[in-house]
Amino acid sequence: MSDVEHLKEQAGIAACRFVKDGMLLGLGTGSTVRYSIIEIARLITEEGMNLIGVPTSEDTRRLSEELGIPLLNIEDSGTLDLTIDGADEFDHNFDLIKGGGGALTREKVVALKSKSMVVVADHTKKVEVLGAFDLPVEVCLLYTSDAADEVDG
């Protein structure tokens, strides 16, 4: 495992310190959160915690199912206790950009339904000025042509 991958693993596991028995959890998307999901599965199987996840992407859904984490769909979940998600980049003010992995809309909905949110990222995601990573763009299907006009200028 590379040094960066080891940092991601440590960060992902550390984020799970906020997880308590009986929680309904938003499960984010990305390479660092993957380690949080693995740790959540361990908390269920080895610690006996009763946890349910709400995935923010199909990748997260597949991994969670493989690991045996019980899941609910976003629309069936109600209020979530905690969401753990990653960031594409963050600055010295802890402003951040996320959603570059293609799950922006679901990540936003899950975050809005959560009482609390932990954003997990290692130092490699820190930038002086936001915008080093490609900026995700969210388009609602009802306004596709309007959005295309805006992007084209």
Each language-model region and where it sits:
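Ligand-binding beta-strand-loop-alpha-helix segment within the catalytic cores
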Residues: L51-K126, E138-S145
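Single, functionally critical "micro-switch" positions that shape active/binding sites
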Residues: T29, A121, A148
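Short, solvent-exposed beta-strand edge segments and adjacent coil->beta transition regions
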Residues: A132-D134
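N-terminal active-site beta-alpha-beta segment that forms phosphate/nucleotide-binding
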Residues: S2-D85, F90
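Single conserved hydrophobic/aromatic residue that forms the stacking wall/gate
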Residues: Y143, A147-G153
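Short, flexible, solvent-exposed loop/turn segments with mixed acidic/basic and small polar residues
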Residues: A41-R42, T124-L130
